[in-house]
Amino acid sequence: MLDEERDRIITVTNILHKGDLPEDLDLGPLVAIDCETMGLNFNRDRLCLVQLSSGNGVAHMVQIEVEQNFAPNLCKLLSNEEILKIFHFARFDIAALLNAFGVLTRPVYCTKIASKLVRTYTDRHGLKNLLQELLDTDISKQQQSSYWGADALTDAQLEYAASDVLYLHKLKDELDLRLQREGRLDLAKSCFDFLPTRAKLDLSGWPETDIFSH
């Protein structure tokens, strides 16, 4: 299938790919990533969509087919040690990608963890709250619980999905400033480095267990 047949341009900034990223797509050394699934149970709910952005205002979205377990170009990016992957709530997305493709995503940066380390004055660490406070940007979460397993996703769904990655680079910059100011950059990196292991624990039967507790 030709790329132009496989890829559907949703808007100027949103591009939908069927099954995998194009082989020649270079998103650079810092890539924002998010996933949409059928639900929160890895044993039941499949991965449906993977969104990626290089921070240039363009969102590439890979629609995953039912029972698909291989996406070579996407997996190559996920496992590339030279590319830092930015997530919001990386723990879930790393586990979802590992469960779907058997690939462990690393290295990673999680804006939710960074927020918890520096925004200790609040318990509101959702992406919408972070963007409102740090970037003065408002995004809609109306499509969050919609049917992501559909053969044809709506423009509204894809606009929502894109919004989850388009701002993560700028958000990381703001959070890094605060982490540096509070002397917690090294602590944050240690947390990020543990996330792939935390995701493996989630998939191996310890999703609600703190193995470090008494």
Q: Model segments located where?
A:
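DEDD superfamily 3′-5′ metal-dependent exonuclease/proofreading module
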Residues: 1-48, 52-214
